[in-house]
Swiss-Prot record:
Family: Belongs to the dUTPase family.
Cofactor(s) needed by this chain: Mg(2+)
EC number: 3.6.1.23
Protein name, as recorded: Deoxyuridine 5'-triphosphate nucleotidohydrolase
Native source organism of the sequence: Human herpesvirus 7 (strain JI) (HHV-7)
Reaction catalysis annotation: dUTP + H2O = dUMP + diphosphate + H(+)
Stored SUPFAM superfamilies: dUTPase-like
Gene: DUT
GO MF annotation terms: dUTP diphosphatase activity; metal ion binding
Lineage: Viruses, Duplodnaviria, Heunggongvirae, Peploviricota, Herviviricetes
Amino acid sequence: MQSLPSRRSETNKKIISEKISETITLNKLPMSRYLHFFLFTVTDVDDIWNFSETKESSLTWPKIDAKQLNEYVNTELTVYQRPFSLLGIPQNGLFKSCEKIYDEFFAEHMDNEKKYLTFPRNRSSRFGFENVPRVNELPILINHFEKSRMDVILNTNKIVLVNRELIWVPCEQVRIFNLNVSLNIPDGLFGILTGTVNDTLCECVTELITTENVISISLINLSSESVMLLPGDIELVINILPCYIPEPWETYNFPSPNFIKFSLITNKDFYVESNNYTIQNFDYMFDCPDELKALIIANKEILCHGLVVETNIWLKNTTPSVKIFNPTSQRIFVQAGICIATIIFTCGHFILKLLPNRVLNQLAVLDKTSMLWFQYSTE
């Protein structure tokens, strides 16, 4: 292989390598909410370029050495083909290329092999791996256990989990499902887990992730029969957000915080009728800066009783109201003094999506520009 002697050529060569490694082609499958995404990138893409110099120009666009490329494909790469949900397309990270199939390259989002993600993608091709600029904050540690039924996809500012095995949810029950994925989130941050299930008769409750080592989700079956969820039917998104603990003079009637969260405790006895809901109001209030807001997330203890608490966004100078559903066929009694939800303060931006044919609304995080530092490992 020959390379141009000029310094300008060497610089352009590196920039071209970085550009090529970011080429992604999306191809949506007919009548499907899934798509295949194809990416071709190599560890050392500079090795497959051929530069030529002519009299008309001192620099020409590089051409691919087809023979060397085929040797690399046949010896270095592995075959992998998998559909990913439209909601879980990786926005950044490291990838593993795969063998050429039908004139396209299928790619799998790589599990980083315990390496740190850097942003923007492939800056190591320009700076060198040892000199890549990185954030100084502590990384968010992700431990993916071998017995997990979920695939883990890392993005710039969130984690996407997709089930790769069948999952059964008994009729008219709440199943707390262990994901066998643990997170170690640095101080000052917390996680919000939201889920989407293809089956309209099955709901995934929003979860708050603070000090939990192993993450679990709550799946609710609203039908009178057991529900079988196929691989790819459950898609979970974990967003990492900054937390805020208000000063005592900024809250009214609040209990003492537990670490970074507050408990929303019932002050009277009440019943929730079968297949119905009730709205409970609380005499709480806070007065914080305008950019701060509180999230009301269901407590897992109330889920064990068969009740579902809808996620809500609580703004300052207002009193909170909580909607509690009873999807079972029995009337449920709730005593005073029970924690039905958790309150946490943050400065993120959110909306509540009202989805068709859904009982619960869904919390959506609008902060898309933040970049986080993940460290992934497997056991």
